[in-house]
Amino acid sequence: MQQHIIESTHVKPTINPKEEIRQRIDFLKAYVKRAGAKGLVLGISGGQDSSLAGKLCQLAMEELREETGDEYTFYAIRLPYGEQHDEHDAQLALEFIRPDKSFTVNIKPAVDASVEAFHRATGLELSDFHKGNTKARERMKAQYDIAATFGALVVGTDHAAEYVTGFYTKHGDGACDLTPLTGLNKRQGKALLHELEAHERVIYKVPTADLEDGRPGLPDEVALGMTYDQLDDYLEGKTIDPTIAERIETIFKRSRHKHHMPASLYDEWWQ
């Protein structure tokens, strides 16, 4: 099972950060040109993943402008739910990325309206957990509105550790047009940020989805019940605690519906 998971994530046991950066920038450029798009859109939270993906997007758009003489733009989108407690980190990330354009969309009015509409329709209160998923989906909706307006594509930040654990919202942060971090585990993403000379606070910020009102800033590792180091070791083919390995494999099987298009009568993956 471990080898199957490693192959499905495309994680290498060792990487050359310079080469990985080059390959991922080239991928972004090639995909944008082939799609006939004029730019890229990405939500910036201030964490490692969006900071890395954002920097790669910005560098790709700069190179396309220089190579073609045409206008290609990277749009960095801040998507707070009201006041973000770690806004300073998000601003540090923007300073590192230096995006062509940036917008801020406060998702709180839209999310609260959706939660209230649910209550009026059902008489029930939407749980904090499901409200968190609503936040993630509203963020992606806003990004697609911006992308459609400017003829751009929406970038996702899914990487190997998130893929294996299904640690993203279906049709939320899991909805996008392309994923430049695919094939990287968490520590490899850090290595690329070091190579790109990101601020230490950006590189080592405690990863959090920060979706639940009742548990603000809940660390990913607490939610997952394992550390990213354990996940990374597993994905690099190393031997880890059998209990953790079993947990990774159980979560992988449970979340595989997130790896496919909607199931139909003619699909076999779900059986």
UniProtKB/Swiss-Prot annotation:
Binding residue positions for ATP: G43, I44, S45, G46, G47, Q48, D49, S50, T157, K186, T208
Reactions catalysed: deamido-NAD(+) + NH4(+) + ATP = AMP + diphosphate + NAD(+) + H(+)
Molecular function terms from GO: ATP binding; glutaminase activity; metal ion binding; NAD+ synthase (glutamine-hydrolyzing) activity; NAD+ synthase activity
Record keywords, A-Z: ATP-binding, Ligase, Magnesium, Metal-binding, NAD, Nucleotide-binding
Entry GO CC: cytoplasm
Membrane-spanning parts: none
Pfam families: NAD_synthase
Gene3D superfamilies named among the record's database cross-references: HUPs (3.40.50.620)
Cysteines paired by S-S bonds: none
CDD domains tied to this protein: NAD_synthase
GO biological process, one term: NAD biosynthetic process
Binding site for deamido-NAD(+): R137, K170, D177, H257, K258
List of residues binding Mg(2+): D49, E162
Pathway: Cofactor biosynthesis; NAD(+) biosynthesis; NAD(+) from deamido-NAD(+) (ammonia route): step 1/1
Annotated EC: 6.3.1.5
Function, in words: Catalyzes the ATP-dependent amidation of deamido-NAD to form NAD. Uses ammonia as a nitrogen source.
Summary of subunit composition and partner proteins: Homodimer.
Similarity field: Belongs to the NAD synthetase family.
PANTHER family: NH 3 /GLUTAMINE-DEPENDENT NAD + SYNTHETASE, NH(3)-DEPENDENT NAD(+) SYNTHETASE
Identification of the protein by name: NH(3)-dependent NAD(+) synthetase
Organism: Exiguobacterium sp. (strain ATCC BAA-1283 / AT1b)
